[in-house]
């Protein structure tokens, strides 16, 4: 007796499997294309050049995280680009005397025009300290924001959400170890920017969810 073979069920199974793979790949590409595109956009927002000119503002906000940031902020203050400066996120126990020891060339401006903020533990806290600082001194026009170049986009996002209509003038600081490195030719820089890109995205979604609905 001849045995009959029916391949129709196998063919249907293969077709279903192929569609599943196509659906998976389509879903993956739908996620990856905007994600990678967003990363490239974010990386291009970061400045890799030292600031040559800067507008005058009412005050300067320096976010701690490196001596370069503080030094550059004090330099901008001493050049007369603002009347006062807040260093946000200072560790407990640090005071003005420590500042003058570390930056003796800026003793005069430290003694007259620098405030230290101790409450901030992160970028959100920096924005909150900046808001309290502006209210305390009646500032409402423009601030110079000093932080590392890779940290600037998220800093501006959080600070703008906190301060509202006050103009924010970025003063990106390029850390010494990262000078001459770009996201397209340095694995370390690419990783650093990738982590910051994720943090920026999470901050953006949090602020978007918190925003009041428009009717």
Language-model segments: residues:
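Amphipathic, soluble alpha/beta structural segments
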Residues: 4, 214-215
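Residues in intrinsically disordered, low-complexity segments of regulatory proteins
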Residues: 4, 18-20, 40, 182-183
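Structural motif marking the loop-to-transmembrane transition
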Residues: 15-25, 186-190, 194
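A structural signal for short, hydrophobic/glycine-enriched beta-strand patches
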Residues: 40-187
């Amino acid at each position: 007796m001849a045995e009959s073979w029916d391949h129709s069920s196998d063919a249907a199974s293969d077709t279903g499997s192929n569609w599943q793979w196509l659906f998976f790949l389509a879903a993956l590409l739908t996620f990856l294309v905007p994600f990678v595109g967003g990363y490239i956009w974010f990386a291009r927002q970061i400045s890799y050049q030292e600031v040559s000119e800067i507008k005058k503002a009412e005050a300067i906000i320096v976010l701690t995280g490196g001596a370069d940031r503080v030094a550059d902020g004090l330099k901008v203050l001493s050049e007369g680009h603002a009347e006062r400066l807040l260093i946000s996120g200072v560790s407990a126990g640090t005071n003005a005397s420590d500042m003058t020891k570390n930056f003796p060339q800026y003793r005069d401006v430290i003694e007259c025009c620098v405030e230290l903020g101790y409450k901030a533990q992160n970028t959100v806290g920096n924005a909150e300290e900046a808001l309290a600082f502006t209210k305390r001194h009646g500032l409402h026009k423009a601030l110079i924001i000093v932080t590392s170049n890779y940290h600037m986009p998220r800093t501006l996002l959080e600070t703008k959400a906190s301060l509202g209509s006050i103009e924010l003038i970025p003063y990106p600081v390029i850390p010494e170890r990262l000078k001459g490195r770009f996201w397209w030719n340095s694995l370390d820089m690419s990783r650093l920017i990738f982590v910051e890109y994720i943090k920026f995205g999470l901050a953006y979604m949090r602020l978007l969810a918190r925003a009041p609905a428009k009717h």
